[in-house]
Structures are given as C-alpha cells and as structure tokens.
C-alpha cells in the first residue's frame, strides 16, 4: 500500500470518527474536550435572546420592560405584513419597521420570506438530503468545520452542549453546502452565519437560507468567501472612496502610515457583524441587511470610521486593524436603537449621493454575474434581487431640445479629445443660417453645440450646489458641467466660423492655469487605461471654448 492510499484511508477514518461523535450526541467527545460543561438550570440565567449567564440575572429594568412591551405591540403589525406580503414587500413601511426592530418570534418567518426559502425547497425537493450524505462521505474540510463549530455561539443555550442537537444540525448544513457550492467550499464565517439562521429556522430552511444569501445578487455575500468573487474589490474600492470623502483626515493618516493596504476593513466588518458584537445588535443589523441588501455595508463602514476617527488618527503600524476591531466592538456596546438610528441616517446620506453601492463590476474583477447599476433611493426595495431602473430626469435639469423635433442633416464629423466624435448638426433647411429663436434666446430653438457620443448621462437626482458635481455611475471620477445658456447659443457662433477654427480651438495645448486646476490633476492621476473612450478628459472649461463662449 503506497503513501497516497494510507493517507486516504487515514482521512476517511478521521472523517467517520468526527461524524460518529455528532451522531452519538451530547458529550461524545474525548475526555480532554475543553468545552464548557452542560448547564442545565436555565431558569434565571438565560436572557431574552437565549444567552446563558453563569450568574443569576438581575430583575428587568424599566427600560428593558418597555422594550419588551414595545416588541409585543409590534408583533401584530408584522403579522399583518406577512399576511399581505405582496403589498408590503416593496413598501417603505417594511424598511422603516426593520430599522425599528423585528420581533423575535416573527424573525424566522420573515427571514424565510425575504430569502424565498419555500420557493427554493419546491424547486429542489430532496436535494438537501443528497448533498448532506455526499458531504459526509467526501468532505475535505470536516476537521476545520468541527473545530469552528466548537467555538460558534457557545454561550447560547442551543449551542452550549458539545455535539448537541444544534451543533449536529450545523455540521450537516456546512457539509451539505461544501458539496453544493464547490467554488466557496467552506470558510470560517459560514459557521457563524448558518448558526444565526439555525436560531430561528429549521435545519433544511437554514441551509437554503445560506444558499440564497450567498447566491443572491441583492446581498452579494459570496464575493467575501469565493476566491473568484468580484464583489470584494468593488465594495473595497467604493469603501475607500466613501471614507476618503467623509473622513479625509483619517484616510490621510492611514495613507501616510501605509496602513490601508495591510488588511481589508470591509472584510473585518463582516466578521464583526457575525461574531464581534452583542447578539442582539448582530441580529438587528442582519435584519436590516436582509431587507436592504448590500446597500447596508457602506453605511456600516462609514459609521465605524466616523466613530473611530480620533482613535484611527493615532493608530500606528503595530496591528492597526486588530485595534480597530477591538475598539469598534467596545464603542458600539451601547443602546441598539442608537446604533440603528445612526445607521439609518448614514444610509439616507449615502443613498442621496449615490455612494451606497459601487459601480458595476468589470469582467476581469471576478467570475460573478455582472452587478446591476445602482439605482436611486427613490425606488422601492425589491426582495428577489431585481432592481428597478434609475428614475428619469426631473424638470430641474431639462435637456434643451426642439419642441417639435425637426429632421437634422449632418454637416461634418470632427474627432475630439477622448475618442468622441462631434457632429455639427442643424435642422434641415437651416444649414449655415442662424435661427431667429436662437438669436432671441428662445428655448424652443436651442440645441446642444457639442454632441459627445461618449458623454455620460447627467445624474439628475442629486442635490447640486454649483455647476460642477460628481458623477457616481462611472468608475473614473468624471466632472460634467450642466448646460448653460452659452452652450445653447453656440450655433449662432458656429454659423459664422468654419469648422477648422473649432478643431484648432480644441486641439490647442492647455495653459498652465488649466493644468493647475484640482479637477485636471485629480482626473489625470486617476485616469487608467480601460476599454472604450476615456471620459476623464471631457472638461468643458472656459479655456477650451472659442472666443465668445
């Protein structure tokens, strides 16, 4: 027998021994098992979340009693929403109530509806049992799974007993998912996520909840556990932009100390949400995450950096993100309603600026499906991962067009900076003749002077102060200027000047004052070779226009 066969038989025997311990049940481990001893008297030592305390709990305070009464009163409202789910699943009321708090006895049915568990069970009858049996026979990570299960939610009454019922169910779920999704296989965080589902869902429902959570585009959690997932890079880039915009001093210190590239703070936050804070706050944040989707990750990151601003500016190179994790947990060990209030405010602010979601991922960023274009917050929240199109442009940014669109005849085509093409167009019958309406500044006779084929659509749902504003739908930081009256009157000047003068004006070298502007320096620094025309050079600055603009 060669070495490979010996190793294979040894792994098979080890796998069978681990499974046999879980089949025997409670206290079936070795004598040197260091797990906590069973604590059977749970009368006055268990809180309302199921956490077992070694000492007897004090009587309820007035605030805790008020919170329990409030949760009981909210139960009927959530039951009504579940009874008429088609009406409430896309409503603002669902989001508002999720931030206020989801009753514990409603959390299981609500999670099941949000993740479409029943639909998955109907589409895959008996598949969970098949995956579970295959995982028992061929799992390659069963030792890691067993080791992680021994430290998962051990203070909870469901998982306190080693090799108990809930630990056995957790083992089955993780083995089945390893077989179901070989790309992810098993990661340490999956044991904590599945354990949270097992607190409120049966075994098979918890498995399909885990499947939906990682497979749904709405939550995009697979990128944090898959080696080929493109979610992490997109969220990481967006996080760096959001934090750098709101906490410039903090990120400046991190860049100066070369701390930003040492560890991913976003992945660190995911682990904090799983097993780093109190169970009550963890459950409430997961409620919001399941309702809102991946939009909740950016606000949580922003809140963390905002709270830790003073401490992060004093962080040295010695374990920066380890300190960040510990201090984040200590800081947010406070009232849950306060945390959710700050989270809601941050969500509204980032959504208003379209900073809650990163731009669509490029094909080279991973094998995951292409990410949908982030929609405005004015849309309704969808529960099946579908996203509505962004709202149309409001009346604040009307595009100057003809009232009755006349036919147009192209005069000439001129290449312009950035690979765009400018077509000098006039209404048929008016080539070279100034329009009387244009001379008078009439709106119905105005059209755009420059027809940029690669110009992005203006983000018309932002609160704009001044003519310059960020466009968040593109990865490059492009600055676009709103259409001014001079742009509308441009054809009057164009009718009097040949096209050669227009080309020479755009081909003229930039002056020193142009190169010294912060917009030009910033865009030239961020401009990288990409597929398609580069948008970073499309500045409609005064120095680039011919005289008279």
Curated annotation (Swiss-Prot):
Know the name of this protein? TBC1 domain family member 3B
Give the source lineage, highest ranks first.
Answer: Eukaryota, Metazoa, Chordata, Craniata, Vertebrata
In Pfam terms, one family for this protein is RabGAP-TBC
Residue ranges, compositional bias (Low complexity): 398-417
Indicate the segments forming the Rab-GAP TBC domain, all copies.
101-293
- Enumerate the UniProt keywords alphabetically: Cell membrane, GTPase activation, Lipoprotein, Membrane, Palmitate, Ubl conjugation
Asked whether the keyword ATP-binding is assigned, the reply is: no
One GO cellular component term of this record is: plasma membrane
**In what way does this protein cross or attach to the membrane?**
Lipid-anchor
Which organism encodes this protein? Homo sapiens
For the region Disordered, give the residue spans: 350-426
Give the PROSITE patterns listed for this entry: TBC_RABGAP (PS50086)
Kindly give the Gene3D superfamilies that the UniProt entry links to this protein: putative rabgap domain of human tbc1 domain family member 14 like domains, Ypt/Rab-GAP domain of gyp1p, domain 1
Q: Describe the processing and modification events after translation.
A: Ubiquitinated by a CUL7-based E3 ligase, which leads to proteasomal degradation. Palmitoylation is required for membrane localization and protects TBC1D3 from ubiquitination.
Q: What's a Gene Ontology MF term here?
A: GTPase activator activity
